[in-house]
Every structure is written in structure tokens, then in C-alpha cells.
From Swiss-Prot:
One of its GO terms (biological process) is symbiont-mediated suppression of host PKR/eIFalpha signaling. The gene is NS. It comes from Influenza A virus (strain A/USA:Huston/AA/1945 H1N1). Upon interferon induction, ISGylated via host HERC5; this results in the impairment of NS1 interaction with RNA targets due to its inability to form homodimers and to interact with host EIF2AK2/PKR. A motif (Nuclear localization signal) lies at residues 34-38. It holds the Pfam family Flu_NS1. One of its GO terms (molecular function) is RNA binding. It comes from the Viruses. Belongs to the influenza A viruses NS1 family. This is Non-structural protein 1. Residues 205-230 are annotated as: Disordered. Keywords: Eukaryotic host gene expression shutoff by virus, Host cytoplasm, Host gene expression shutoff by virus, Host mRNA suppression by virus, Host nucleus, Host-virus interaction, Inhibition of host innate immune response by virus, Inhibition of host interferon signaling pathway by virus, Inhibition of host PKR by virus, Inhibition of host pre-mRNA processing by virus, Inhibition of host RIG-I by virus, Inhibition of host RLR pathway by virus, Interferon antiviral system evasion, RNA-binding, Ubl conjugation, Viral immunoevasion.
């Protein structure tokens, strides 16, 4: 087992414990509590997969964090906070592309967790690119504002947007939703690629063909979704 995978899990367990203490003192808002619940389920799944006890991992994670904080000088901490904690807003789409109304000949809508996926199933044999506007923190996609699928002619044929009634979503939520949208569009022989900006901050990688590196879990979910639509 990769030691970095273990240490990452241990630190995540301890940080979840800290956030839980914050929630217990009624200091967390609704999105904070929503992420807390989602991350708890995620940690349970990861612990089961890795065969690690969460309570033990939390104690080890605490030791790792305490060691890092002890070694960190105040000046270095200030510089890290200033450079890393500032959330950036990145835009693939123009204001016109974001605000433009669009219509579907054969509408399909699916809710995936806190995200709503919409696509036009009448679109066939097109070259499509996915563009998104989103915020980034720690070099990773933090919050999706809006994602849209465009043909080469500029027509909008698909969309992923957060559900107002379910605030808060994770990077994994976004990647899973993108996998579902790609699967739905490719079912009609469309060629789909993802913008380099979105690839970089959602997957931290970039492929020349514009295809994101979907995990086996995301591929299975995409396949199940496609079968349910046929």
C-alpha cells in the first residue's frame, strides 16, 4: 500500500475530527455541515477499502499535523496562507456564454448528488467541448459555478449546475457529474472533450485528446446511467 495514501487518509481523519468539534460547538454554517456529512461517508468508504481503523488513523493524523505545525515558522505559515487560501475564480466561458438561454429538442435531466445535469439527446455526431466557470483553492477545483457543453458551432447542448436546495459539493461530485454528461453525449456518437483549464484543476492532469482520466468507479456510474437512459 502506498504510504502517502495511508498518511493522507490519517490526516483527513484528524481534520474531519477538528471540523466535527467545530460543528458540535454550533460554529458551522449549512454548507460546512453538508460537507462534513459527505466527508464522513467518504472516510468510512476509504477506511473500509484501505482496511484502516478510523479512530487509530485519527490519532496518527493528529501526530502528523502537530509535527508539521511545530516545524512551521510563523513567517512561513503566513506566506503559505497568503498564497494558498486565496480562492481564485477561473472562467472558460464569457458572460454571454454563461447567461445565454438555450433549448432542448429531446431534454434529459438527471440529479447527481448536489448537481443537476441537463442534456439534449437529439444532438448526434457532433464535436463537443465542455467549458466551466469555477473557483479554485489549493490548486484544485473548489466550487463549480456553471458548466456547459458547446458544439463547434457554439450551440449549447448540455449543462451541469449546482442545486440551490443542496448547497455544497465536492471535487468528486463534479467529476462524477462530468462523467455522466460525457457518457450521455457520447451515446449518440458525439465526440466530447474537456477544456484544459477544467482538466487541470478537476483532475490535475491534461490529455491532448481532452478526455479526463475517469476512475473505474466513475466509468461504472457512467455506464449505469447510459443503460438507464436507453
Amino acid at each position: 500500500m502506498d504510504p502517502n495514501t495511508v498518511s493522507s487518509f490519517q490526516v483527513d481523519c484528524f481534520l474531519w475530527h477538528v471540523r466535527k468539534r467545530v460543528a458540535d460547538q454550533e460554529l458551522g454554517d449549512a454548507p460546512f455541515l453538508d460537507r462534513l456529512r459527505r466527508d464522513q461517508k467518504s472516510l468510512r468508504g476509504r477506511g473500509s477499502t484501505l482496511g484502516l481503523n478510523i479512530e487509530t488513523a485519527t490519532r496518527v493524523g493528529k501526530q502528523i499535523v502537530e509535527r508539521i505545525l511545530k516545524e512551521e515558522s510563523d513567517e512561513a505559515l503566513k506566506m503559505t496562507m497568503a498564497s494558498a487560501l486565496a480562492s481564485r475564480y477561473l472562467t472558460d466561458m464569457t458572460i454571454e456564454e454563461m447567461s445565454r438561454d438555450w433549448f432542448m429538442l429531446m431534454p434529459k435531466q438527471k440529479v447527481a448528488g448536489p448537481l443537476c445535469i441537463r442534456m439534449d439527446q437529439a444532438i448526434m455526431d457532433k464535436s463537443i467541448i465542455l467549458k466551466a466557470n469555477f473557483s479554485v483553492i489549493f490548486g484544485r477545483l473548489e466550487t463549480l459555478i456553471l458548466l456547459r457543453a458547446f458544439t463547434e458551432e457554439g450551440a449549447i447542448v448540455g449543462e451541469i449546475s449546482p442545486l440551490p436546495s443542496l448547497p455544497g459539493h465536492t471535487n468528486e461530485d463534479v467529476k462524477n457529474a462530468i462523467g455522466v454528461l460525457i457518457g450521455g453525449l457520447e451515446w449518440n456518437d458525439n465526440t466530447v472533450r474537456v477544456s484544459k483549464t477544467l482538466q487541470r484543476f478537476a483532475w490535475r492532469s491534461s490529455n491532448e485528446n481532452g478526455r479526463p482520466p475517469l476512475t473505474p468507479k466513475q466509468k461504472r456510474k457512467m455506464a449505469r446511467t447510459i443503460r438507464s437512459e436507453v
